[in-house]
């Protein structure tokens, strides 16, 4: 067996949405590229709700597509519902949004990346940047492999020193049941970079078999055929599925208020500021205390999945 020499033009660390686009773009522009991921079965994993686009975000996906990116194509191929938001306004305000099959989304990304010339994929964890003469020239991995590169792109998402909060319980991790990555943050600090911690949250998922859909309002997808990509004509491959609408009530709010003392957002555990337009359910009932209900969307996670995502109900409250 010939010794494998790890010399690349570009190494991309992390195979989420940004990393996949960066690696794909670099390879297609002719650079010998390596994409490093902790888990090759989680490439392009949709960490929160299995949806792409929406107001403002949908325009960004189309801009990525116009510049030759792959996200729009992957989304179209994995869509289980497509809707144009803001239809009551003029066309300039319309925003495309797609519900995706979480498993299919990963599979479509893998198909694209594994058939892209100049692109290799390596499963490992980067723990250190190799720097010589003030210049990044490679990475060192948890397995002890050193890889050379002319440039390194960090697209680490939530994994650098990631910390998960379940009420007062704290667990190191980048996502549920996935480990954090240590070493890079500490090295960046030593090199003089300022680092900070960002916060995001996600709701518990619910089992489809436990839902009484007769009590919910069905939200169908659009019947006219829209898509994200201008570059690829895709016929819907998957069964189109409905989302469902419901609301919290005062009884829900009372239960949530009783647990606020155990919420990391309100007991001092979490100091970071969360995303502006995606507040947790705790934040909603505190900030908008005058509201007697909040809208929730139950979204399917895939054609063959029993999991439903509760959009509008992200929380760091304990499981109780």
Regions found by a protein language model. Give the residues of each.
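Short, Lys/Arg-enriched N-terminal segments with co-localized hydrophobic residues
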Residues: 1-3
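Conserved FAD/dinucleotide-binding core of flavoprotein oxidoreductases
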Residues: 226-270, 292-320
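Beta1/beta-strand and adjacent pyrophosphate-binding region of the FAD-binding site
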Residues: 5-18
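Amphipathic alpha-helical blocks
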Residues: 268-280
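Short hydrophobic core segments
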Residues: 11-13, 146-157
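Conserved N-terminal/central alpha/beta ligand/cofactor-binding core
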Residues: 6-7, 24-128, 143, 155-175, ...
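Terminal amphipathic helices with adjacent charged low-complexity linkers/tails
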Residues: 201-216, 220, 280-281, 285-295, ...
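Conserved beta-strand-loop-beta-strand element in the redox core of flavoprotein oxidoreductases
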Residues: 130-146, 152
């Amino acid at each position: 067996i010939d010794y494998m020499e790890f010399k690349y033009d570009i190494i991309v660390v992390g195979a989420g949405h940004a990393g996949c686009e960066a690696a794909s773009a670099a390879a297609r522009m002719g650079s010998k590229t390596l994409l490093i991921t902790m888990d090759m079965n989680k490439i392009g994993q949709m960490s929160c709700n299995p949806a792409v686009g929406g107001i403002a975000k949908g325009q960004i996906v189309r801009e990525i597509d116009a510049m030759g990116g792959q996200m729009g194509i992957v989304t179209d191929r994995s869509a289980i519902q497509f809707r144009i938001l803001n239809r009551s306004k003029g066309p300039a305000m319309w925003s495309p949004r797609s519900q995706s099959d979480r498993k299919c989304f990963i599979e479509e990304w893998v198909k694209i990346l594994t058939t892209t010339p100049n692109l290799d994929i390596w499963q490992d964890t980067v723990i250190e940047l190799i720097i010589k003469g003030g210049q990044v020239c490679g990475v060192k991995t948890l397995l002890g492999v050193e890889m050379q590169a002319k440039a390194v792109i960090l697209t680490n998402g939530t994994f650098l020193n990631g910390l998960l909060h379940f009420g007062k319980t704290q667990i190191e991790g980048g996502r549920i049941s996935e480990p954090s990555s240590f070493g890079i943050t500490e090295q960046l600090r030593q090199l003089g970079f300022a680092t900070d911690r960002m916060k995001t949250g996600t709701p518990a998922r619910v089992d489809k078999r436990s839902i009484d859909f007769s009590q919910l309002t069905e939200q169908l997808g659009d019947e006219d055929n829209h898509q994200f990509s201008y570059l690829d004509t895709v016929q819907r491959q998957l069964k189109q599925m409905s989302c469902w609408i419901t609301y919290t009530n005062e009884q829900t709010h009372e239960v949530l208020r009783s647990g606020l003392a155990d919420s990391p957002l309100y007991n001092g555990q979490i100091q970071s500021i969360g995303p502006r337009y995606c507040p947790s359910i705790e934040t909603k009932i505190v900030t908008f205390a005058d509201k007697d209900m909040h809208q929730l969307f139950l979204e399917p996670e895939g054609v063959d999945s029993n999991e439903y995502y509760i959009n509008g109900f992200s929380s760091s409250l304990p499981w109780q």
